[in-house]
Amino acid sequence: MYPSLALTANHAQPAYSHDTPNFLHSTGSPPVYVPTSRMPAMLQSLPYLQSCDTAHQGHHLANHPGWAQTAESHAFNASSPHTPTGFSYSHSPPVGNSSARDGGYQSPLIMGGGARDQYGNTLVRTGSYPSPYSYVGADMPPSWAAGHFEGSMLHSLQGRQSLSGRRSSLEFLEEFPGEGRECVNCGAMSTPLWRRDGTGHYLCNACGLYHKMNGMNRPLIKPQKRLSSSRRAGLCCTNCHTSTTTLWRRNSEGEPVCNACGLYMKLHGVPRPLAMKKESIQTRKRKPKNIGKGKTSTGSSTSANNSPSSVTNSDPTPVLKTEPNITSQYSGQAIVPVSQGHSQTDDLVNGSHELKFMPDEYTYSPTALSQQSGLSVPLRQESWCALALA
């Protein structure tokens, strides 16, 4: 990018510096693009190009086929502070050793500071264009004095930095929306949901809902808890003048009455007599619901575990009536005679003996049961068939 590199290309032929608006080339190297404004500063930094005569420069510039010299142009001089408006064409001595080549490579570093100063001073004097080094941050001060436009650019950079700082703070608040907010009504700092009133102020969830439902601000003083119904202050039964009850009622006139007087008036239609007033509140003694179920379950279990003697004395035991001279024809059944007093009484009435058996412990054949009972229909072999025969 630096034009001085092209000056060390050829050793046999002299290298010429052709000051065109955009190109600098020698006889043995391709042209290199160089801005026109940097050419005077570069030529000023090269001492062996300043010894050329001005007449020779003007002669070659006039004979150049591609460009014509203007009337107001003048030759470039090292003492002239302004950049030339025309073009110069000068010879340069041949470069014969490696030291000149090294100097050519070092020339960009040598001309860097001077070119920057010359370029910057020119722009400061004209005041029409900003500095080309304005992209450098504010922490890197330039080597020339800041002009009008450069100062404005620095101020704009500082303004952008301040805006970026504000933007970052706003983004931080948006990232944590609950931070730094306070309810304007109760002063709460944290709430599940932030709301706004009609003026845009922040309200906590409770105050916002209260304002939305009631149309007014939520009261800061919490209301006192209501007393229990049995100890409400200032309440007294208009009938019996008691102040203790489980439930306060109202009569037809809207006056408060105790639970007892209110129920009595509701059921009988007359006021409750004062003679029925008691000092203590009578409560109903309700039986627990599980007691009845427990009794039925225990009764069934005891009846199932009773002995045969107790079974014979119980009333619901099935009874099978047979003739006195007939013996049992079906196997597996034990016939138990009843006591004589009981059997004699039954003989007088029925003229037969009663035999009791255990239906749960024995099985019976259907043919024997049908022959014994005198039934023509065969019985099904089930445990409850003996109950049907009773």
From Swiss-Prot:
Location of this chain's protein in the cell: Nucleus
Region (Disordered): 76-101, 279-324
Domain of life: Eukaryota
Gene Ontology BP, a term: cardiac muscle tissue development
Annotated Basic residues bias: 283-292
Record-level GO cellular component terms: nucleus
GO molecular function terms listed in the Swiss-Prot or TrEMBL record: DNA-binding transcription factor activity, RNA polymerase II-specific; RNA polymerase II cis-regulatory region sequence-specific DNA binding; transcription cis-regulatory region binding; zinc ion binding
Ranges of Low complexity composition bias in the record: 293-314
Protein name: GATA-binding factor 5-A
InterPro entries hit by this protein: GATA_N, TF_GATA_4/5/6, Transcription_factor_GATA, Znf_GATA, Znf_NHR/GATA
SUPFAM superfamilies: Glucocorticoid receptor-like (DNA-binding domain)
Zn finger (GATA-type) location: 183-207, 237-261
Record-linked Pfam families: GATA, GATA-N
Annotated organism of origin: Xenopus laevis (African clawed frog)
Bias (Polar residues) ranges: 76-100
Keywords of this entry: Activator, DNA-binding, Metal-binding, Nucleus, Repeat, Transcription, Transcription regulation, Zinc, Zinc-finger
Tissue: Highly expressed in heart and throughout the gut, with lower levels detected in lung, gonads, liver, and gall bladder.
